[in-house]
Amino acid sequence: MKPNEFLICLDAGHGGMRNGTGPEKYVTYPSKCIQHRTGRFHSYGWFFEGVFNRSLANYLQQYLLDYGFQVKKIYEPINDTTLIKRCQLATSYAKAAQHSILVSIHGNAASPTARGWEIFTSPGETKSDLLATCIGEQVITATPGWVHRPDYTDNDLDKEARFQMLTGVAMPAVLSENGFFTNYSDAGLMIDIKWQQTIAKAHAKGILDYAVQQGVEWQ
């Protein structure tokens, strides 16, 4: 199987920005955002998760295309496409591919002290577990000293959840949470373009590792 016969359906959660920079221009406002007391972030201390998700996903798309993979975005640049619609798009694209996966990019939110990276699959043992492990191992290698939040209770590093993006498609699917934007230190990393590129490259390398194990020819 050639890389261009392997399809990645790429998802970025939540909405983007309409023309402007204020919070009222953020499609998902007042959800999926926070205003930190200091620092500029996206605008006057505001961090907008959907904007971050799109930036990281765009870098990931380019690295995957550089490997020769097919990539189909299932999100819009600005609008917050419904979960059902995004799953339907992924399913439609997958029908024409020899092999397909779904990767959903997110930032996390919790208490101000929560930090780090984690990745989710649907419950049970599936190929999604291997995909999550391949990506997770690359992210952990690429970010020494950062907080990693694996769950090895079932002998792999992913966590399990019944998120729509994971259960609404038949293909292997993972959802990565790339830092807590509610934590000031994590948000400072997440807004940095070089850090986004590092995380995106790690995702791409992990996807390549998985694809090779599924029969993709790579030198």
PLM feature spans:
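Active-site-proximal helix/loop segments of hydrolytic enzymes
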Residues: K2-L7, Y44-Q219
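Active-site-proximal loop motif in hydrolases
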Residues: L7, A12-L56
